[in-house]
Amino acid sequence: MPTSHPLTLLLRPHDILFFRDSRPMAGASAGHGDRFPFPHVLNSALHAACHRAFPTDSPVAYTHARASASKQRDSQRTERFGSLRTVGPFPVAEDGRWFFPKPGDLLDPRSGPVILPFEASDFPGHSSLPEPLQPLGSHVQAGKSTFPQWMDRAAFTAYLHGQVIESSGLAHNDSFFVTEESLGIGMNPDTGTTNEGQIYSRRQLRFREGCQLGVLTETGNQHQKEEDLLEQLFPEDGWIRVGGEGRVCQVTKASKQPSALLPTGPAIRGNRVKWVLLSPAIFPQLAASDKNRPHPGGWLPTWVDAETMQVQLMDGPGPNKARRLGVEPGSPVSAKLIAARVERYVPVAGWTNPSEGETGTGKEGARSTLLAVPAGTVYYFETASEEEAQRLANALNWHGQPGSGTITNRRSTLLGEKGYGIGVCAPYETL
């Protein structure tokens, strides 16, 4: 079985943080750097810290377990630290509580989930939705008050169990951070002087005193016997550069494991399952191949058939992975997607710095912008039985089966190892 080294890190910013999106910082466009950091930002920061701490001649490599020898020979670079996996960041209050994005089916703090699928029989006429998708509705009139953006673990657990959500477990963005605006002037990197007329504005995040970023990390796999990578990187409390301009955060190691920090899914009663995203997910468009039909991606998970909406997941590892792990392979789950509550997409971009010997190879520069489904998105599924519904929940829950405390499932097609596609399941009722 895999040898995993879980570690929980708390990052306390010592200054403003800047997390810009893919929009240019020129003309009338302000530098939108005041958004909460995406999962890949912290993962990249840890990777960069590992590269600085363990140079290329270091015996600590942690290459990707599935990187074959032929691929490494053909590549100009080594996939160092490929076993590093992260979940988060999430805001952590001064009292140590972790907070998570509000599910999209909540409208009012005083009520539970109110946005639900209609029964198909309620709409016997024509619908623009392809079968078997059903419209969503609410039995509560939307008010002017806005639901807080964050819920702590206790409030999220109450939501998953259909219980009353205590207001003490809810928080707005300004409970953790505020936006600051500033002006800057463009610099010439060759001369180190300013560029005349290149003035820009930007927005940044300043965290409240005592508030932190919480990140769950894992390193190691069944092929590696080394000591934990991050334990070597942070033998005691340390420092790390995060986001644009390399702003510094103090790093503290925490003892709590994922099962004590992340909300876990309850046992499923009935044949309906909803999957709530705790982090964004990326489902790219897929071209047709010999084995698969084309898939539009976007809001629709690539593991859902685009024509029938049938789920194409297994309740355990696939044949190849099961062979590597020495366990029994899973069996297909029979379920279909019937509705989804999806807010506006969020752009995911980045920048690749060249490694030694790669300058001028085209591997450096801006990465392609990806469009992600935001955290808080809710997907609604139906199955033929309660047993099948629980199997679906086991395939979608971040922890797999009930009672498990390990991070098992990352259901984003891209960047799952960086913390995308982390979700939790619960039963639901129709209107």
What is the meaning of each model-derived region?
Residues 1-431:
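Conserved active-site/ligand-binding neighborhood in enzyme cores
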